[in-house]
Amino acid sequence: MSELSIYSEQGGEPVFSTLDSARIQHELSLRGIAFDRCASKAEIALDADQADILSTYAEEIHRIQALGDYPTVDAIRMKPDHPDRQALRQKFLSEHTHAEDEVRLFVEGRGLFCLHIKSEVLQVTCETNDWISVPAGTRHWFDMGEKPYFCAIRFFNNPNGWVANFTNDPIAERFSKLRD
């Protein structure tokens, strides 16, 4: 289930938490973050490749592309046995920004986006059928968990794909990670 928890940037207990997707959408929109749910699709086959995944979600991809300038789309799929899972997790766990929006449609599993906005940290657990759009320049990090299980369609306006500018702020170390 999707979840939003809002913390002071100092850490500690959340000052707000909800599992209600309408409240999640509202609270995020107040902070310039787009969040929505897409219609459910059939489960993705274990042997599905990127082309199969993108074809299955073509309608949603076109709808999201129409919301912004996202000509490049790909799919990333992580499973607990992925050989590079620990290295990739560590890379995404460091606070960073992008020169472009970070837009993700989760089509399988879940992941945790942590958004550092002003004096707050918002932890958004995204589940299957959630999409989130984090505006360019937003300080954030992402946790896929120790045993990652997710597939997300990624939307880019930069043909080079995922390009991070790391802040070197250790803030992510003060906050909880995705619970497996």
UniProtKB/Swiss-Prot annotation:
- Site positions (Important to generate the dianion): 104
**What's noted on cofactor binding?**
Binds 1 Fe(2+) cation per monomer. Binds 1 nickel ion per monomer.
Output the SUPFAM superfamilies linked to this UniProt entry: RmlC-like cupins
Q: Tell me, what is an example of a GO biological process annotation in this record?
A: L-methionine salvage from S-adenosylmethionine
**Which cofactor is recorded for it?**
Fe(2+); Ni(2+)
Q: Which UniProt keywords apply?
A: Amino-acid biosynthesis, Dioxygenase, Iron, Metal-binding, Methionine biosynthesis, Nickel, Oxidoreductase
- Subunit structure, as described in the record: Monomer.
Which PANTHER family does the entry link to? ACIREDUCTONE DIOXYGENASE
The family assignment reads:
Belongs to the acireductone dioxygenase (ARD) family.
- What name goes with this protein? Acireductone dioxygenase
Source species: Synechococcus sp. (strain WH7803)
